[in-house]
Amino acid sequence: MSELKYKRALIKLSGEALAGDKKFGIDPETVSNICREIAEVLEMGLQVSLVIGGGNIFRGLSSSAKGMDRSSADYMGMLATVLNAVAVQDALEKLGHATRVLSAITMQEVCEPYIRRRAERHLEKGRVVICAAGTGNPYFTTDTAAALRGMELKCDVIIKATKVDGVYDKDPMQHDDAVMYRQLSYIEVLQKNLRVMDSTAISLCMENNVPIIVCNMYKGGIKRAVMGEDVGTIVQGG
């Protein structure tokens, strides 16, 4: 068995990733492909918790900018993350991996409530834990939820799995001359306003000294990251 550098990881996925080329909604084939990448590290013995955004269905911040009440918009965004969580749960279980969705907003007919100790027990038993509905509070992003759950569940690393290979000085989708950073400090991310995660999430990771690895969700990026290989961009240290 390949050597893991980390025992427990929180993987953050954007909601948009689940839409594939459709840009909106959930594409089952794309979800299955992403889950196959996650299954690879599960089979290596990694304990995995997931936080998934909801931007493929509803984005609270942009809706509030268009006149909707911010709290109402954020709650709608949180509900969107539950839809995504159930879709990923279904795909992972089809691959043979027991998965539990734990929601910060109680909806007992659909998923379990998020209780930290319960989540830890699931992880210890080898189940995937998907933390849904953000923090359960408006004004907090799913990036912040990922950082918070990562701390609560004592994860060794937070992996932000994206469509690109790491963190760049500018958008690589729009600029061919974009340069990828191999390593950054938390302070550099904040000072340069790099779009790794929002500032609240970065600050939480900095205060608790939890590294963030930004890598491609495909190309075996997640597997290489948890093995400690030089992949993507790592954010750590002062």
From Swiss-Prot:
- EC number(s) stated in the UniProt entry for this protein: 2.7.4.22
Q: Which SUPFAM superfamilies match?
A: Carbamate kinase-like (SSF53633)
Does the UniProt entry include the keyword Lyase?
A: no
Give the pathway listed in the UniProt entry for this protein. Pyrimidine metabolism; CTP biosynthesis via de novo pathway; UDP from UMP (UMPK route): step 1/1
Question: Where does the UniProt entry say this protein principally localizes?
Answer: cytoplasm
The organism's superkingdom is given as Bacteria
Residues holding ATP: K12, L13, S14, G15, G55, R59, T162, Y168, D171
Q: By its UniProt entry, which Pfam families does this protein fall under?
A: AA_kinase
The entry's cellular-component GO terms read: cytoplasm
InterPro entries, per database record:
AceGlu_kinase-like_sf, Asp/Glu/Uridylate_kinase, Uridylate_kinase, Uridylate_kinase_bac
The alphabetized UniProt keywords are: ATP-binding, Cytoplasm, Kinase, Nucleotide-binding, Pyrimidine biosynthesis, Transferase
Localization annotation: Cytoplasm
Q: Which GO terms describe its biological process?
A: 'de novo' CTP biosynthetic process; UDP biosynthetic process
Regulation of activity is described as: Inhibited by UTP.
Q: Where does UMP bind?
A: G54, D74, T135, G136, N137, P138, Y139, F140, T141, T142
Q: Is Nucleotide-binding one of the keywords UniProt gives this record?
A: yes
Which reaction is recorded as catalysed by this protein? UMP + ATP = UDP + ADP
What GO MF annotations does this protein's record show? ATP binding; UMP kinase activity
Question: How does this polypeptide assemble, per the annotation?
Answer: Homohexamer.
* Database matches in HAMAP family: PyrH_B
Question: Per its database record, what is this protein's job?
Answer: Catalyzes the reversible phosphorylation of UMP to UDP.
Q: Which family does it belong to?
A: Belongs to the UMP kinase family.
> How is this protein named in the record?
Uridylate kinase
Source lineage: Bacteria, Pseudomonadati, Thermodesulfobacteriota, Desulfovibrionia, Desulfovibrionales
In the UniProt record, the gene name given for this protein reads: pyrH
